[in-house]
Amino acid sequence: MFARQSLRVAQPLKQGFRKYSTEAPSKGKSSLAPIYLGVGLIGLGVGLYRYNSASAEAPPAERPKVFTGGDQGWVDLKLAQIENLSPNTKRLRFEFPDKEAVSGLHVASALLTKFKPQGAEKPVIRPYTPVSDEEQPGYLDLVVKVYPNGPMSEHLHSMNVDQRLEFKGPIPKYPWEANKHKHICLIAGGTGITPMYQLARKIFKDPEDQTKVTLVFGNVREEDILLKKELEELENTYPRRFRAFYLLDHPPKEWTGGKGYITKELLKTVLPEPKEENIKIFVCGPPGMYKSISGPKVSPTDQGELTGILAELGYSKDQVFKF
C-alpha cells in the first residue's frame, strides 16, 4: 500500500595508601590515622555510588491522575487559555489543580463535559477527546469546532478565561497496545480527527511500535483542517510509516489534494486490501460520513452492522471500529 503510485493518489487526488604503608612512623605518633581516614573516604564513596546507582535504577514516581473513572464523579476545571485556530474552531486549555498531575486518560479514550444552560431542566453532556498528550502534566487541551444549534460547542466558544467546566472520565473507546495491528487506517471528517490524532501520536511516540498509519481526512474548506501542523510533523518525521490524504468540499484554486467527498475509488486505492492480515480501519466524523463509509453505531457500546463503502469493498465488521 505504500508503493509510490498509491501514495500519490492525493496529487491531485491525492528521530595515598601506598604512601602511608611505606613511610616510617613518626616518633610518639600513630601512623594509622591517615589509613583510617582513607578507608572511611572509600567507604563513603562506595556508599554514595550505591545510593546514586539505586536512585538511577529506581522507576520514576507515578504522577497523580485527575480522572480515575468509576465512582469519581464530575471534576471541575478552570479555563486557563484560549487560542483561535480558525473562524469557527478554538483550542481551549483547562488547567489541573495539581500542576504535577496528569489527566489519567489512556489511548483511546475521551472525557464527558457538562454544563447546565440557564433555565434548563437538564444539563447538556457531550464527549470530547483531548488533543494534549496523555502524559502532559498540569493541563489538558480541547479542540472545539462550533456548530449551529450545538449547545455544548456554543457554550465552550462563549467561555472566558477563569470560567470553569465540569469533566468526567475517562470514557474508554479502543484499547491500544504497541503493534496490535500491522497497518491501521484512519478515516476522519471534521472534528473526528481528534481521536485519530490521539491514536497516531501514541503510536509514533513509542519507539517499539512499528504500526503503519494511513489517514484519509475530509473537510469543507482548507481552514477547517484541524491539527494540520501536527499531522504534517508526523508525515515529515515518519515518511515511510505515515501517509495523509486530504479532501475538501470547497477547495481553493491552488489546492492539490482531493476534491469532494471521500469516495469508494479513493479508499480502494489508498487502503490495504481486506485480505491483508492484521489491519484495522477506524472511522470518526459526522453522521453523514458514517452512513456513507461504514454505517452508524447503534449506541456507544454497540458498533452496529458494517454497511456503506467499507462493506462494499469487502471489509469485515471485525476489521472496522467506529469511534
Swiss-Prot record:
CDD domains: cyt_b5_reduct_like
GO CC, alphabetical: mitochondrial outer membrane
SUPFAM superfamilies tied to this protein: Ferredoxin reductase-like, C-terminal NADP-linked domain, Riboflavin synthase domain-like
GO biological process terms, semicolon-separated: ergosterol biosynthetic process
InterPro entries noted in UniProt: CBR-like (IPR001834), Cbr1-like_FAD-bd_dom (IPR008333), FAD-bd_FR_type (IPR017927), Flavoprot_Pyr_Nucl_cyt_Rdtase (IPR001709), FNR_nucleotide-bd (IPR039261), OxRdtase_FAD/NAD-bd (IPR001433), Riboflavin_synthase-like_b-brl (IPR017938)
UniProt keyword annotation of Lyase present: no
The UniProt record lists the keyword Repeat: no
Cell location: Mitochondrion outer membrane
Main localization, broad class: mitochondrion
Listed PROSITE patterns: FAD_FR (PS51384)
Catalytic activity: 2 Fe(III)-[cytochrome b5] + NADH = 2 Fe(II)-[cytochrome b5] + NAD(+) + H(+)
Pfam families attached to this UniProt entry: FAD_binding_6 (PF00970), NAD_binding_1 (PF00175)
Membrane-protein topology: Single-pass membrane protein
Parts of the chain that traverse the membrane: 32-48
Names of the cofactor(s): FAD
Domain FAD-binding FR-type, chain residue ranges per copy: 72-177
Keyword set, alphabetical order: FAD, Flavoprotein, Membrane, Mitochondrion, Mitochondrion outer membrane, NAD, Oxidoreductase, Transmembrane, Transmembrane helix
EC number from the UniProt entry: 1.6.2.2
GO MF annotation: an example: cytochrome-b5 reductase activity, acting on NAD(P)H
Entry's family note: Belongs to the flavoprotein pyridine nucleotide cytochrome reductase family.
UniProt function note: May mediate the reduction of outer membrane cytochrome b5.
Protein name as catalogued: NADH-cytochrome b5 reductase 2
Gene transcribed to yield this protein: mcr1
